[in-house]
């Protein structure tokens, strides 16, 4: 049984105010009867006001004009945002606040593929989605669809990603401004530093707010981590496209950039200009190494099992880091 039920009315147009109410009443009644007892979150997604078509002109269909509908709507939360990205991200926050993971989405058939594309970007495998068709009659019926989307093209997917990225960039930093802790011990030919937990947009308590690691087992999606990384790159002055994290296995493997990348490694070393390497640290110690003579650097995270990793890195004059995160790179020429 779904813990949360979402009804997608985003962008729908209705052919009369009366039919608008009848359709919504039927759908909301069905949801309430089947899910109200067990679902902890019932939600309607819409874009501003729902518009009703009358004689070729658009009138605003105010939901509050129907007493029966108004009473029923009290059982639902309405999320009305100007974009689908904003709507779904707002809903995700509400779902995460309640620690829910089983979600039913009732969506018009022509919008199902579009909805799935947004969900794939904004949610992780922690969540379990099921989809149900919102019954929409297209011929002399109650609802009209403005555009049909049966398949997502590469261009449409790019537009979805751009919409999400634009929205995430507009979000304020949480828990304070972004901070990068540096040391005068490392010469300024290296961009280096340790980040803290402030300045990002991750709102999950255990990840808030500057999470730089995404996982299918976490609620923070890749797009949020990428936005945190973008903000870090802008603040520190490195190229986010040339950013490399360790892939820890709590062993002694070191990736020397330029050689074949191992499947997992607890340290990275490099002498390549313009490349940034980072180690993420939670309960392990992140370490940065910089050799101004060889112009090489490295990062690793070190716990009880990482002694061999540290020795290996010192031999190659590089760095270590882990999940706080630590970052370092050799500045590109110019």
Locate predicted features.
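N-terminus-biased targeting/localization segments
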Residues: 1-96, 114
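Phosphate-centric recognition/catalysis
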Residues: 222-302
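Phosphate/pyrophosphate-binding loops at sites that engage ATP/ADP/AMP, CoA/4′-phosphopantetheine
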Residues: 34-39, 94-97, 233-236, 320-330
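Acidic, glycine-enriched active-site microenvironments
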Residues: 170-175, 180, 186-191, 200
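Active-site beta-strand/loop microenvironment that shapes enzyme catalytic pockets
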Residues: 10-11, 16-28, 40, 46-56, ...
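Generic structural signal for well-ordered, non-membrane alpha-helical segments
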Residues: 20, 81-84, 88, 111-112, ...
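Intrinsically disordered, low-complexity, positively charged segments
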Residues: 190-231
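Extended, non-transmembrane interaction/recognition domains
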Residues: 107, 111-168
């Amino acid at each position: 049984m779904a813990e949360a039920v979402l009804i997608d009315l985003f962008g729908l147009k209705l052919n009369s105010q009366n039919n608008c109410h009848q359709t919504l009443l039927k759908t909301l009644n069905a949801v309430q009867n089947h899910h109200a007892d067990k679902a902890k979150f019932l939600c309607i997604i819409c874009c501003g006001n729902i518009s009703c078509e009358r004689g070729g002109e658009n009138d605003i269909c105010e939901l509050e004009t129907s007493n029966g509908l108004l009473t029923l709507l009290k059982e639902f939360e309405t999320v009305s945002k100007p974009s689908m990205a904003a709507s779904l991200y707002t809903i995700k926050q509400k779902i995460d606040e309640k620690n829910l993971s089983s979600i039913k989405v009732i969506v018009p058939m022509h919008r199902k593929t579009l909805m799935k594309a947004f969900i794939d970007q904004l949610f992780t495998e922690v969540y379990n989605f099921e989809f149900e068709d919102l019954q929409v009659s297209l011929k002399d019926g109650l609802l009209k669809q403005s555009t049909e989307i049966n398949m997502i093209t590469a261009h449409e997917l790019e537009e979805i990603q751009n919409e999400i990225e634009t929205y995430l960039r507009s979000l304020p930093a949480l828990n304070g401004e972004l901070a990068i802790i540096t040391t005068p011990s490392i010469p300024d030919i290296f961009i280096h530093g340790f980040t803290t937990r402030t300045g990002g947009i991750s709102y999950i308590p255990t990840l808030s707010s500057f999470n730089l690691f995404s996982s299918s087992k976490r609620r923070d999606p890749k797009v949020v981590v990428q936005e945190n990384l973008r903000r870090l790159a802008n603040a520190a002055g490195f190229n986010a496209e040339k950013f490399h994290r360790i892939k820890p296995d709590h062993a002694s493997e070191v990736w020397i950039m330029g050689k074949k990348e191992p499947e997992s490694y607890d340290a990275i070393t490099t002498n390549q200009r313009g490349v940034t390497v980072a180690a993420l640290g939670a309960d392990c110690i992140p370490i940065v190494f910089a050799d101004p003579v060889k112009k090489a650097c490295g990062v690793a995270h070190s716990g009880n099992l990482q002694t061999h990793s540290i020795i290996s890195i010192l031999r190659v004059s590089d760095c270590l880091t882990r999940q706080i995160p630590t970052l370092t790179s050799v500045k590109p020429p110019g």
